[in-house]
Design a protein with these regions (language model features):
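Short alpha-helical transmembrane segments in multi-pass integral membrane proteins
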Residues: 2-43, 100-167, 213-269, 325-390, ...
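Short runs within selected transmembrane alpha-helices of multi-pass transporters and secretion channels
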Residues: 93, 97, 162-180, 188-196, ...
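Small-residue-rich hydrophobic transmembrane alpha-helices
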Residues: 72-132, 169-183, 187-188, 286, ...
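Structural signal for membrane-spanning alpha-helices in multi-pass inner-membrane proteins
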Residues: 134, 177, 203, 207, ...
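Helix-terminus/linker motif at the lipid-water interface of multi-pass membrane proteins
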Residues: 51, 55-73, 142-149, 205-216, ...
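Hydrophobic transmembrane alpha-helices of multi-pass small-molecule transporters
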Residues: 84-87, 131, 199-204, 233-237, ...
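Transmembrane helical elements of multi-pass membrane transporters/channels
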Residues: 41-60, 161, 195, 228-232, ...
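Residue-level signal for short hydrophobic patches within transmembrane helices
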Residues: 32, 36-55, 59, 81-88, ...
C-alpha cells in the first residue's frame, strides 16, 4: 500500500538541519530506556522549542508595544479568540498524538496510520472553519470591550490576517503532534525554531518598514506571524516527503471510520476545551477589569504573555511525558507510567518555583518591557507578585492533566481544567473583585490553583492509580 506524500518544496531535508535531527525511526526505546534520561531526551527539545516560541511571542508583543499602547490593548483583546483557534489546533493534535502513541505501543501500526491520516484531514477542515468563524465575529467581539474605534480597527486588522493562516497553523500542529508521537522531538524543535526565527526577523521589517518594504504597523506583525507558521509547515512537508516515517498518511485510510473519528474527538475535544478555557476566562476577567481602567486589561494581557514564557519549560516536560505515558500504557508498562508521572511532577514543581522567584524579584522590569506607563507598571507589579503565589502548586494540575490526556482519558483531564478556569476562579474573581477591587482578581488566581491541585490529584488517582 503506497503512502501519500505531499509534493516536494524544492530543497532537501539535509539543507534544513541535518539528517540526524529526524531520527529515531524505531520507537521501542520508549519502553526500554531508563525513565529519567528518556524523559529528559524527549522533553529537552520541546523545552527549547517552546521557550523560543514563547520568546517570539514576547518579542512580537514588544514590537507591537512600540507602535502605541492602543496597539497593545488591541492585541490583548484579540488574545482570547486567537488562543481559542490555537487551542483547536493543539487540542485536536493531542488526540492524534495520544491515539498514534497508544496504537503503536500496542503494536497496531495500521490503526496508527489511520489515526494519523484522519487526524490530518480533520485538522485542515478545522482550519477552514476557524478562519470563516473567527473573522466574522471579531468586529462585534472587540466592540464589546472598548469604545475606542482605533483599538477596534487595529484588532480587526490584526485578527483578519492572523486567521487567514489558521489552516496552515492547524496542519503544522497536526504534523508536530504526529512526529512527537513517535519520538521525533528534534525534528519538531527544528521546525518550530525555524518558524520562530523567521517571525522574529520579519517583525521589525514588516511593522516599521525597511527599504522597499513599506511600514505596515500591526498588520505587519500579523503577516510575520503567518509567514513563520507557513515556514514551519514547509519543513514538516519536506521532511515527510523525503524521509521514511514510522507513521504514514494513506489515501485508502481516508474512508469514513466513525469509530476512529469518535476516539480522536473523545480525546481531542476535552483537550481543546482544556486549552480554550483560558480564552473564556480572559474574556470574563476583561469584563470585570474594564470597569476599573483599560490599564488593568493591558496588565492581564501582559501577564498572559509572561505566563506563557514562565510556564512553557514545565509544559515542554509535560509534552515530552505525554507520548511516553501513552506508549507505555498501550504496552501495559504500568510501573513506568507511574514513574513518568512522578518525575514530571517533581521537575515541573522545581521550574515553577524558579518562576515564582523571578516574578517576585523582577515584577516591575518584566511589566516595563511592555509598557512605559507608570500606572500600568504599578498595577502589573502588584498583579505578578500575587498571582505567582500559585505557580508551584499548579504543577499538580498541569502534570495530572497532561498525563490523563496521554492515557486517552480526556474527560478526566477536562474536569481539572474546568476547576482551574471556570468552577473556582470565575466565582472567586467576581466575589473578590467586589470585595477588594481589581486586586481581588489577582488573588483569585492563587486560591484557585490550591483548590484545583487537590481536585487534580484526586481525579488522577481515581482514573489511573486504582485501575
Amino acid at each position: 500500500m503506497a503512502r501519500f506524500k505531499p509534493p516536494l518544496c524544492g530543497f532537501s531535508c539535509a539543507e534544513i538541519s541535518g539528517k540526524e535531527a529526524f531520527a529515531p525511526m524505531n520507537d521501542t526505546f520508549m519502553k526500554t530506556k531508563p525513565v529519567f534520561p528518556l524523559l529528559v531526551s524527549m522533553a529537552l527539545p520541546n523545552v527549547i522549542s517552546m521557550l523560543v516560541n514563547s520568546l517570539y511571542n514576547i518579542v512580537d508583543s514588544l514590537f507591537v508595544a512600540q507602535i502605541n499602547e492602543q496597539a497593545m490593548t488591541a492585541l490583548s483583546l484579540v488574545f482570547p479568540i486567537q488562543n481559542f483557534v490555537n487551542a483547536v489546533a493543539i487540542g485536536f493534535g493531542v488526540g492524534i498524538n495520544a491515539l498514534v502513541a497508544l496504537y503503536r505501543g500496542a503494536g497496531d501500526h495500521d490503526r496508527a496510520d489511520a489515526a494519523a491520516t484522519h487526524g490530518m484531514a480533520l485538522s485542515v477542515l478545522h482550519g477552514i472553519l476557524c478562519t470563516l468563524a473567527a473573522t466574522a465575529i471579531m468586529p462585534g467581539f472587540l466592540a464589546r470591550f472598548t469604545a475606542d474605534g482605533t483599538i477596534v480597527s487595529m484588532g480587526v486588522t490584526y485578527s483578519t490576517i492572523v486567521f487567514l493562516f489558521a489552516t496552515v497553523n492547524m496542519a503544522s500542529l497536526a504534523f508536530e503532534k504526529l512526529f512527537q508521537a513517535v519520538g521525533r522531538m528534534k525534528l519538531t524543535m527544528t521546525a518550530l525554531i525555524s518558524g520562530c526565527v523567521c517571525n522574529i526577523l520579519l517583525d521589525p521589517v514588516l511593522i516599521f518598514g525597511l527599504g522597499p518594504v513599506p511600514a505596515m504597523g500591526i498588520a505587519g506583525a500579523a503577516l510575520a506571524t503567518g509567514i513563520g507558521q507557513a515556514a514551519t509547515l514547509v519543513i514538516y512537508l519536506v521532511v515527510y516527503s523525503t524521509t521514511e516515517s514510522p507513521v504514514h498518511l494513506r489515501r485508502k485510510a481516508l474512508r469514513p471510520d466513525l469509530s476512529l473519528e469518535g476516539r480522536l474527538y473523545a480525546i481531542g475535544v476535552p483537550a481543546i476545551l482544556n486549552l480554550a478555557l483560558p480564552s473564556l476566562l480572559v474574556t470574563f476577567l476583561n469584563g470585570l477589569l474594564a470597569a476599573f481602567s483599560e490599564s488593568y486589561v493591558v496588565v492581564l494581557g501582559i501577564y498572559y504573555k509572561l505566563q506563557t514564557f514562565l510556564y512553557l519549560p514545565a509544559s515542554g516536560i509535560v509534552q515530552g511525558m505525554r507520548p511516553l505515558i501513552g506508549y507505555n500504557y498501550g504496552a501495559k508498562e504500568h510501573a513506568r507510567v507511574a514513574k513518568l508521572y512522578q518525575l514530571t511532577l517533581g521537575m515541573s514543581a522545581v521550574i515553577m518555583a524558579a518562576g515564582t522567584v523571578i516574578c517576585m524579584a523582577a515584577s516591575a522590569p518584566l511589566i516595563g518591557l511592555f509598557s512605559s506607563t507608570p500606572e500600568t507598571i504599578a498595577i502589573g507589579q502588584t498583579a505578578l507578585r500575587i498571582i505567582c503565589l500559585g505557580f508551584v502548586v499548579s504543577a499538580v494540575s498541569t502534570t495530572s492533566s497532561g498525563a490523563l490526556e496521554g492515557l486517552g482519558k480526556g474527560a478526566a483531564s477536562l474536569v481539572i481544567s474546568l476547576c482551574r478556569y471556570v468552577i473556582f476562579i470565575m466565582p472567586l474573581a467576581w466575589l473578590l473583585c467586589h470585595q477588594l477591587g481589581p486586586t481581588g482578581v489577582w488573588h483569585a488566581f492563587w486560591v484557585t490553583e490550591v483548590l484545583s491541585a487537590v481536585i487534580a490529584f484526586a481525579v488522577y488517582r481515581k482514573s489511573v492509580i486504582k485501575k
